[in-house]
Amino acid sequence: NRSTVFENRKAESFYMPREQRLTITARDHIKIAVCASLIEEKTEPQVLREDHVVLKLLGEQPYQRETSFIIDQNSNAKHLTVGEAYVTEGNWAGFPPHKHDTDNMPKECIAEEIYYFLFDPKQGFAVQCLYTADGSIDEAYRVKNDELVEFPYGYHTTVATPGYQTYFLWL
């Protein structure tokens, strides 16, 4: 339903449960993100159209981002949440830094996160910070177009560079 992620902020998706097959035939160039998690329950396939996607503004300036929730607790997918974030040029996302390595609902849940980045124009970049309270991890990465970052644990936050639209698919 869109030629680039920057064209329409409501992606359509398809949930395919375990032990099933799916064939995709495209009429033109297509880029697909395959997102998965472990699940033992049997669930049904589900088409998730634009009207299922929830758009939310998260944070406040200068750390605000527009986020779309594509696959969430209202889908047949269990143990999987997928969304997209659009970060305003020069803004922070996920600030103040947060983490997902302690079971303390509703403030925090245990979850690994992966971000897939795209920029417009493509030579753009973001800075991804990752650290732990004890200092065992304390890193900042320059993330470029078409790159992934994984957060198995620890605090993380992202800053978008001025002059570039920053997008990341998150799960």
Question: What is the predicted function of each stretch?
Answer:
Residues 29-89:
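Surface-exposed beta-loop interaction hotspot
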Residues 1, 84-88, 107-134, 142, ...:
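Short, conserved beta-strand element in jelly-roll/cupin
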Residues 161-171:
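Non-heme Fe(II)/2-oxoglutarate
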Residues 12, 20-22, 28-32, 80-83, ...:
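Generic beta-strand structural signal
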Residues 43-48, 69, 80-83, 92-100, ...:
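A short secondary-structure junction signal
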Residues 7, 135-136:
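Short alpha-helix capping/helix-loop boundary micro-motifs
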